[in-house]
């Protein structure tokens, strides 16, 4: 019985072991199958991700390739454009060199013709000398035969006659050569001047003394005048310009002989009209802004003139003075346009004669620089120009050209002569200058200068076409009683020093302002 239990137990153990073994085997197979499936999924996912990343990298590479290609194409395009510009410049330079070569070739041909003519003349002289020698021998023999002269006396007589004949022939040859040279020189000079004028021709317009300012409507006139005329009086006092308001629809007129002052007034009035707020404080503010804007315009004008002429390394103060020449006139001719024209003419003449073109243009541009400050003093513009050129370290050639362009001093360089010639050509063109406006402006400048010479005067303005001078005085130096005396003194000085028709009204303005701020 016990044995049976043992056997059953053993059988049960064996059966259990077998069952466990088979169960464990199936579990392992199942786990293996699951792991295999999971691995396949992971591999598939990895493959898909790798494919996605490969496509993304490919797209990025294509984008980078497109960007690089576009960049390269842009650089190539810019390079081609730059090369085209360089090629154009080279072509222009080549054309210039060709023209110079042609000019040199013409001169060389002219020299060859002269040399050939001289050779023929020399040959002719040699032949004449040979004939003279033969004649001397014949004369000597003849004289020895028919006269009682000694050989030495006969020799002296023949030599004297021969020398006289040769001297006459030589004088004729020299005279013909001089006439040919003078004719050719005159023709060459005319050609040079004509070419210079043709290559630098410029229109010239006479300068006026008024500026018309358009208004949006006629109601603006009343706002400009202000209550009891305070706005227009303040505007005229601050700017020194006559503001004329008449029946002209939607327009007012600014009148002043000083173009800079008139332009500042125009800019300020335009700003006031656009802003709409017109009162004394606003007027003064806009005038100050207009002065700053005018300074910028003057500087830019000077820089543009220097740039257009290809001039470099010029002092900024000189450039500013060049810009001021735009607002100065000489006998109705705009001084800046005249100076640019002289610079171009001098440059063309210098190029034809083989001189330094840049220095010639520089001297031509600066020859009237003294006129930018001449209204402040009685010194001649040539002397003022020399002082300015020395002050701003210009070369000796430029300084001499400025000093000599009106024959004030002796020209020490060829460029000085060229600048003087170019100045004469520019000034002598028909219609370039008008004396009437210049004399009128000179009279107004003299009127202001007389007033400014008195102690305590801050600034004076000639207005009403010279029929009135308005004098602004320093209130801390001139009281009310002194203002009355100053009026009489200025009147006497004007009567003594100035010639004029009619009457000149002298108005002395003394203004005291007290300003404080409430905090």
UniProtKB/Swiss-Prot annotation:
Q: Name one GO molecular function term.
A: RNA endonuclease activity
Which stretches are transmembrane? 2-22
**Which residues are in the KH domain?**
209-294
Which parts of the sequence belong to the HD domain?
335-428
Pfam families registered for this protein in UniProt: HD, KH_1, RNase_Y_N
Q: Which domain of life is it from?
A: Bacteria
Entry's localization field: Cell membrane
Entry membrane topology: Single-pass membrane protein
Q: What function does the entry list? A: Endoribonuclease that initiates mRNA decay.
* Name the record gives this protein: Ribonuclease Y 1
């Amino acid at each position: 019985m016990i044995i049976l239990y043992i056997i059953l137990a053993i059988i049960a153990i064996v059966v259990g072991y077998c069952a466990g073994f088979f169960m464990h085997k199936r579990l392992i197979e199942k786990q293996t199958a699951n792991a295999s499936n999971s691995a396949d999924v992971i591999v598939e996912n990895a493959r898909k991700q790798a494919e996605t990343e490969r496509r993304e990298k490919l797209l990025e590479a294509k984008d980078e390739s497109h960007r690089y290609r576009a960049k390269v194409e842009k650089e190539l395009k810019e390079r081609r454009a730059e090369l085209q510009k360089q090629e154009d410049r080279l072509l222009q330079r080549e054309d210039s060199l060709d023209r110079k070569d042609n000019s040199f070739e013409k001169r060389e041909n002219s020299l060859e013709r002269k040399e050939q003519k001289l050779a023929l003349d020399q040959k002719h002289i040699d032949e004449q000398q040979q004939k003279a020698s033969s004649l001397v021998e014949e004369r000597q023999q003849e004289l020895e035969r028919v006269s009682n002269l000694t050989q030495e006396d006969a020799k002296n007589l023949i030599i004297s006659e021969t020398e006289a004949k040769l001297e006459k022939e030589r004088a004729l040859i020299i005279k013909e050569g001089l006439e040919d040279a003078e004719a050719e020189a005159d023709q060459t000079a005319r050609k040079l001047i004509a070419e210079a004028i043709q290559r630098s021709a410029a229109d010239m317009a006479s300068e006026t003394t008024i500026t018309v300012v358009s208004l949006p409507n006629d109601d603006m006139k009343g706002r400009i005048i202000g209550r009891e005329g305070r706005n227009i009086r303040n505007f005229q006092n601050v700017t020194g310009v006559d503001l004329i308001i008449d029946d002209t629809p939607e327009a007012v007129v600014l009148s002043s002989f000083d173009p800079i002052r008139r332009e500042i007034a125009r800019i300020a009035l335009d700003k006031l009209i656009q802003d709409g707020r017109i009162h004394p404080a606003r007027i003064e503010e806009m005038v100050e802004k207009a002065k700053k804007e005018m300074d910028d315009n003057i500087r830019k004008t000077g820089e543009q003139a220097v740039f257009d002429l290809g001039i470099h390394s010029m002092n900024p103060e000189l450039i500013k003075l060049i810009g001021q020449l735009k607002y100065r006139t000489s006998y109705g001719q705009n001084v800046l346009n005249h100076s640019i024209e002289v610079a171009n003419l001098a440059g063309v003449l210098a190029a034809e004669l083989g001189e330094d073109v840049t220095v010639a243009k520089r001297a031509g541009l600066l020859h009237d620089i003294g006129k930018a400050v001449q209204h402040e003093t009685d010194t001649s513009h040539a002397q003022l120009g020399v002082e300015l050129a020395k002050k701003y370290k210009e070369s000796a050639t430029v300084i001499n050209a400025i000093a000599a362009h009106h024959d004030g001093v002796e020209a020490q360089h060829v460029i000085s002569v060229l600048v003087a010639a170019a100045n004469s050509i520019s000034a002598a063109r028909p219609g370039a200058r008008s004396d009437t406006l210049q004399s009128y402006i000179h009279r107004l400048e003299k009127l202001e200068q007389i007033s400014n010479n008195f102690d305590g005067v801050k600034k004076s303005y000639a207005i009403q076409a010279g029929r009135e001078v308005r004098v602004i005085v320093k209130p801390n130096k001139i009281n009310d009683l002194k203002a009355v005396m100053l009026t009489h003194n200025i009147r006497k000085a004007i009567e003594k020093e100035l010639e004029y028709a009619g009457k000149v009204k002298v108005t002395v303005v003394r203004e005291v302002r007290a300003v404080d701020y409430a905090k």
